[in-house]
């Protein structure tokens, strides 16, 4: 393994005007670790050991940003959010060989959620993820949009309908 460094900063701002709000967040992260790798010798089935390479930590994007439009009306039991997010390029899989790591590309996302709480304790929750249908490659699977409607009865039972 090796000695890792991980540092950064985060800014989080939220502002409401009556029932409407905006929430913004930005995170910068710098991470690095130097590890040993193997390197193929040109024209041979053998490989050289003792080679090192510096890389970021796995799943550590240097830039992550979110901005959300919020609606909150506690008197009438409404809560809603339209959230956009950006995640920068990040290391997905570390290879034992030099210059053979796999990376995830930067991605934008847009999600919508809403909840209505009734005075009798029942609430209905709706969530739609990945409204822009951004394609993410995760271990050879393509993840697309999905939608959930959840009804909570007395906060003990949960009925869920999902479309994928």
Regions inferred by a protein language model and the residue ranges of each:
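Short, functionally important structural connectors and interaction interfaces within domains
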Residues: 12, 49, 99, 123-124
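Gram-negative outer-membrane beta-barrel transporters
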Residues: 1-93
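A broad helix-preferring feature
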Residues: 78, 111-113
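Juxtamembrane/interface motifs at transmembrane-helix termini
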Residues: 43-44, 101-102, 144-146
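C-terminal beta-signal and adjacent terminal beta-strands/loops
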Residues: 85-94, 115-164
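Extracellular loop and loop/strand-boundary signature of outer-membrane beta-barrel proteins
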Residues: 8, 50-56, 96-101, 111, ...
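Transmembrane beta-barrel outer-membrane domains
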Residues: 2-6, 58-62, 101-107, 157-163
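Flexible, active-site-adjacent loop/turn segments at secondary-structure boundaries
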Residues: 55-56, 105, 129-130
């Amino acid at each position: 393994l090796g000695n890792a460094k991980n540092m950064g900063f985060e800014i989080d701002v939220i502002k409401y005007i009556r029932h409407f709000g905006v929430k913004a967040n930005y995170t910068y992260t710098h991470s690095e670790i130097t590890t040993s790798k193997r390197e193929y010798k040109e024209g041979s089935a053998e490989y050289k050991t003792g080679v090192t390479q510096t890389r970021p930590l796995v799943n550590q994007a240097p830039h992550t940003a979110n901005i959300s439009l919020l609606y909150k009306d506690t008197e009438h039991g409404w809560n809603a959010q339209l959230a956009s997010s950006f995640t920068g390029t990040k290391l997905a899989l570390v290879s034992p060989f030099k210059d053979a790591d796999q990376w995830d590309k930067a991605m934008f996302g847009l999600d919508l959620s809403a909840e209505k709480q009734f005075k009798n304790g029942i609430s209905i929750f709706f969530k739609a993820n990945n409204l822009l249908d951004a394609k993410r490659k995760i271990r050879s699977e393509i993840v697309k949009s999905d939608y959930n409607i959840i009804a909570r009865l007395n906060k003990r039972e949960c009925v869920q309908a999902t479309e994928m």
